[in-house]
Amino acid sequence: MPKIYRVVGDTSTGMKFVVEVVGERPYDALEKVYSVLGSRHKLKRTQIRIREVSVVEPSSAKSNEAKMLMVLEKVVRY
């Protein structure tokens, strides 16, 4: 069952971040954060420092995208 994870950390450029992502386990959430920050800010994995990964209840999540993904029963890719 997927869960919403809140990932807190900072980068070597001094930028702090809090990202909420949906994943089956914490490892999946970390991979998504590395992917998103790498593509948006052109950061390498070694430039991203993860401070905390925690499970968040859907009712207390701040990300609308994460809330909507939790409502879906299944996703079909073509």
Curated annotation (Swiss-Prot):
Disulfide bonds: none annotated. Pfam families: Ribosomal_L18A. This is Large ribosomal subunit protein eL20. One of its GO terms (biological process) is translation. GO terms for molecular function: large ribosomal subunit rRNA binding; structural constituent of ribosome. Keywords: Ribonucleoprotein, Ribosomal protein, RNA-binding, rRNA-binding. GO terms for cellular component: ribonucleoprotein complex; ribosome.
